[in-house]
């Protein structure tokens, strides 16, 4: 599930052109740029708690504004989480950590990361549809190479 969530987010990055990164459907909601930056920050928060027992703060949403700045930060955040997921074992998944003043398992934190990422993927899908862009999860796969006999 994590691979699907991260691939959907990274797929959006590729599909949303630079000129739309400041787009927000209403003034009360985040722009494309703010959503991508928020997801990057959240990767550090959740995977930091699961991997290091503490939230890691990068301040991406507050400090980075452009696609050129946010994309590398998002990719680094995803790589950080890739490492955290790779280190998850049956034994350490059940270890308890603190998240939002609650005691939860490390696996619970990682599951919450997936849910949070997909929540914001849903926001991105709506924004993309409003701009006539087909989101990654609705894009048909490329045709398979035909086999010659």
Label the model's feature ranges.
Residues 3-7, 63, 67, 72, ...:
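Carbohydrate-interacting regions of secretory-pathway proteins
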Residues 7-10, 20-59, 98-149:
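Short, contiguous alpha-helical
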